[in-house]
Amino acid sequence: MTTVQQRFAVPPDVLWNVLPAGVAAIGGQQPVYDGPRGFATCRTGMSLLSWGQHINVTVSPSEGGSTLTIMTVLKLGVWDWGEGKRIANRFAAAVAYAAGTAALT
């Protein structure tokens, strides 16, 4: 399990509206968006080197903007060998690019 958290100087609704860009960047499948709770989830598919990951994303208000939290969990296995962190960082970078801003932290 890997968790990546980044703050942005934009309102939560701006990040929420560009979450599909993050899903597309990681090749996410079957996305589910729960707007009232600020929660989204998707999964990555299996490949030659991976069984795939479950990705849970929350967007929450924070001082001066909003916070994006991305948590990845292996579908099967014990170690992800850094795959979860790479996926979470790719997701966050795509969201930042689509929102036209950079992460504060």
Language model features: what each stretch is:
Residues 1-105:
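Ser/Thr-rich, low-complexity intrinsically disordered terminal regions
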